[in-house]
C-alpha cells in the first residue's frame, strides 16, 4: 500500500514537508511556542462566543494520521464569534494531536512547556465565503480554537469520543457520531492567546486565526493510550499504530501573540 505523500515518520514527516509544500517554511506557520512575557495584552479583544448545536454532529472518521469528528456546516447552527474575529465562523470538525509518550503531544507550547495532547476545533468564515473549500486558503478563511490537554485525571467529557474509536480502528473507517456539543470540551475559563498562523499539517495554508485557551483540560494516561491504539493502516494491512501526530513549533518570524487577559 503506497504511503501518503506526508505523515509523521522520518521519511515523510514534518522535516520533509517543505519539499512538497514549500509554504512549510513560510512566515506564518503553526504551531508556535507562546512566550508569555512577550505576549501583548490587547484590550480590544472581545470575549469568545461559541454556540454549538449538538444536532449538527455528524460522523467520526479515521483519516490515517488522526481522527476527525465532523459537523454539518450548511447553516449557522454551530458558530464561533468574538475574540479576534470580525466575522462569524462555522464549526466543521474537531480533532486531536498527541505524542508517543505523555511527556509531549501538544503542538503549541507555553514558555517551552509541552502538554500531553491538544484539541483543535476548526471553523471556516461563512460570512465571507460560501464553502470550506473556498475559505481554506484565504488569510481570514479559518479560525481554530486550540485547547491544551494535561495528563492527570480522566476527563469524562471525552468518554463518548473514546467509546466511538472502536468502530474506526483503521484508516478510512467512519461511523455516525451524533448529538454532541463540543463546547463541553472547553475549559471553564475562555481567556485566550491569539495570533495569525497556519494549518499544522499539509497543505499548511496560512489561513488560520489561532485562538489558544490559556486554561488546559485534563486527560488521563489511559485515555491517551486509546488515541494511540488507533491504526493508520487500512484494514488487512500490517498494524501501524498512530503513535504521534504533532508538528514541532515553528518560528514566530516577527508575529505578535496577543492576550485577552
UniProtKB/Swiss-Prot annotation:
A Pfam family: Carb_anhydrase
Top EC class, one word: lyase
Activity control: Inhibited by acetazolamide.
Keywords: Acetylation, Cytoplasm, Lyase, Metal-binding, Zinc
Compartments (UniProt record): Cytoplasm
Active site feature: 65 (proton donor/acceptor)
Requisite cofactors: Zn(2+)
Residues reported in the UniProt entry to bind Zn(2+): 95, 97, 120
GO MF: arylesterase activity; carbonate dehydratase activity; cyanamide hydratase activity; zinc ion binding
Gene3D superfamilies (alphabetical): Alpha carbonic anhydrase
GO cellular-component term (any): cytoplasm
Binding site for substrate: 200-201
Signal sequence, renumbered to the chain: none
Membrane-spanning parts: none
Alpha-carbonic anhydrase domain residues: 4-261
SUPFAM superfamilies: Carbonic anhydrase
Catalytic reaction(s) noted: hydrogencarbonate + H(+) = CO2 + H2O; urea = cyanamide + H2O
EC numbers, comma separated: 4.2.1.1, 4.2.1.69
Chain positions covered by the region annotation Disordered: 1-31, 240-261
Residue(s) carrying N-acetylalanine: 2
Family from the record: Belongs to the alpha-carbonic anhydrase family.
Free-text function comment from the UniProt entry: Catalyzes the reversible hydration of carbon dioxide. Can hydrate cyanamide to urea.
Protein name per Swiss-Prot or TrEMBL: Carbonic anhydrase 1
Originating organism: Gorilla gorilla gorilla
